Amino acid sequence: MGLDIQTEIDKIVIEKVKPEVEYYDVMGGSHRWEVKVHDHGKVALVDTMPRLAPVGQTADFSICQAARVSYGAGTKKVTEDKGLIRYLYRHQHTSPFEMVEFKFHCVMPVFIARQWIRHRTANVNEYSARYSVLPDKFYHPSIEEVRKQSTSNRQGGEEALEPKTAQEFLDYLDKVEENYKTYNELLEKGLSRELGRIGLPVSIYTEWYWKIDLHNLFHFLRLRMDSHSQKEIRDYANTIFALIRPIVPVACEAFIDYAFESLKLTRLEIEAIRTGSPLNTTNKREIEEFEEKKKLLFPNTQA
C-alpha cells in the first residue's frame, strides 16, 4: 500500500454511534449452541449476524430493517415486523433474508458431507486429510436403522431391512472400518496422508465450518428436512432448524407456513382440480405425485 493511500486512510474518522435503544446478545452470551447427532456427529451454532438485537425483539428485526431501507422507514412495531416478514417470504422477496447469517461447526460422515456440499451457496472450510490424520470415528447405524431400498424412490430407503441381512450389512461395515488400522500403519511407514486417505470408507467422520445466509439456508432446509431426503442428513437439517428457530422465530414460522408445509400446483394440476378431470398427462410419475397432493388437499375424499 502506497504512502499516499495510507495517509488518506489515516484521515478517515470513525464515529462509534451509541444505540438509541438497549440491545442484547441473541445467543444469550454463549459462544456456541451444540447438539449431538448420531454416534459421533454434532452441529454447533457458533455465531450469527446480527449478534445483537433490540431488547424485546429477535434477529428477525434485521430482515425488516433491510426491507424498509427501500422506502426510508426505520424499524417499526414488532407486530408490523411479523406481517412484513410473512409478506416478504410469501412473495419471494429474498434479499432481506440474506441479511441474516449463521455460522455452524458441523461434524458428519463423509457420505453426508458429499450430499451437503451440493448446496453451493455457503462458505465452507473443511478438515483436510491431506494435512492431518483422520480420527478413528465411523458412522455405524443401529440394526433398526438399516433400511431396505425404496420401491418408489431410487435414491432412498424406506422401512427397516429384515434382521439377517441388516446384520450382514453391519458386519460389512465392521470389516471396512478395519481399513483404518492399515491406514495408520502405512502413514507410520511414510505414506503420504493425501494418498493414505483414499482407502478409507465414506462412513468416516469429517468436520467443517459452514456459514450461510438465511435465504439460502431455508432452501437447504426445505430440501433436506423433506421426507424424501436421506434420513441421516435429515437429522442434521432438523437439528439446524432447531438451532436457528429461537433466533429468527418469525422467519422460521413463515418458512414452515409458506414453503415446507405448502404445496406447489402445476398448471395441469390446477386444471384437473378445477374441472374434476384426470391429469392431462401420460407421465406415471406426474400422476403419482398429483395423487399424493390430492390426499393432502382432500384427506376426507374417497379414492
Swiss-Prot record:
Free-text comment on the cofactor: Binds 4 FAD per tetramer. Each FAD binding site is formed by three monomers.
Recorded catalytic activity of this chain's protein: dUMP + (6R)-5,10-methylene-5,6,7,8-tetrahydrofolate + NADPH + H(+) = dTMP + (6S)-5,6,7,8-tetrahydrofolate + NADP(+)
Enzyme class: transferase
Coiled coil feature spans: none
Pathway field: Pyrimidine metabolism; dTTP biosynthesis
Positions bound to dUMP: Q115, W116, I117, R118, E126, Y127, S128, A129, R130, R197, R224
Entry annotation: catalytic residues: R224 (involved in ionization of n3 of dump, leading to its activation)
EC number: 2.1.1.148
UniProt domain ThyX: residue ranges: 41-258
GO biological process: dTMP biosynthetic process; dTTP biosynthetic process; methylation
Annotated motif ThyX motif, positions: 118-128
Record keywords: FAD, Flavoprotein, Methyltransferase, NADP, Nucleotide biosynthesis, Transferase
GO terms under cellular component: phagocytic vesicle
Quaternary structure (record): Homotetramer.
Biological function: Catalyzes the reductive methylation of 2'-deoxyuridine-5'-monophosphate (dUMP) to 2'-deoxythymidine-5'-monophosphate (dTMP) while utilizing 5,10-methylenetetrahydrofolate (mTHF) as the methyl donor, and NADPH and FADH(2) as the reductant.
Similarity comment text for this entry: Belongs to the thymidylate synthase ThyX family.
PANTHER family, sorted: FLAVIN-DEPENDENT THYMIDYLATE SYNTHASE (PTHR34934:SF1)
Protein name as catalogued: Flavin-dependent thymidylate synthase
